[in-house]
Amino acid sequence: MKSSIINNSQKIDKLFKGVVSHNRSGKIEHNFNNKIISILLDLKSNNTNLPMFFSTNRFNVLSWSASDHGLRVKNSNKNDLYKFIINLTSKLGFKNKEIRSIKLLTFPKIFGYGFNPLSVYFCYNTQNILI
């Protein structure tokens, strides 16, 4: 993805532009290069500096909904998703107090339609190191 470096010291959401490429060879060849937009969300922060064409949990040109992730509970929010990830990491042996922040890199919906083949969660410890 082409954008600025992800800086964990900032507790703001970020929008990224990039390209997804695919190339299949063999009997049936296929390839594509598609432009994409992704967003990095700090699940513990309510602060945002996103443009007015982006909304959380409601329709807009670009939007994101917590209910599309985690337990997929209607009317859930970032905090619910944060708790879901804390629960998953505790099953892996991490203690809640070891995790300082959780960020989600995902694809937003465009005019209410979404295609999200991949969501990545970044968990940072109390020393601000990715774990």
Task: Write out the residue ranges for each language-model feature.
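Mature, function-bearing regions of proteins
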Residues: 1-131
